[in-house]
Amino acid sequence: MRLLRWIFQRDNQTLTCQVDQQPGAGNYTLSLVPHSDAAAEIAETFNTAWSAFRRHATIATELRRSGWTLAAYTAD
């Protein structure tokens, strides 16, 4: 189940950073997916939602410092 999805943009590049809860497992996955190459997805797994959201916030901060802007977001 998707909990959070932010789409970042820099120049002509687009990147999704999202947090999903794994059904039945109680784990949370944070994924970074470049839209130009979905096969280059990076995923990290966390035991708590708090840890996944904290990591998402850290990545979002670093992306903004690197010139990325938030283009869209959803909280499903």
Question: Where are the regions that the model predicts?
Answer:
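A short, charged, amphipathic alpha-helix used as a generic interaction element across diverse proteins
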Residues: 47-65
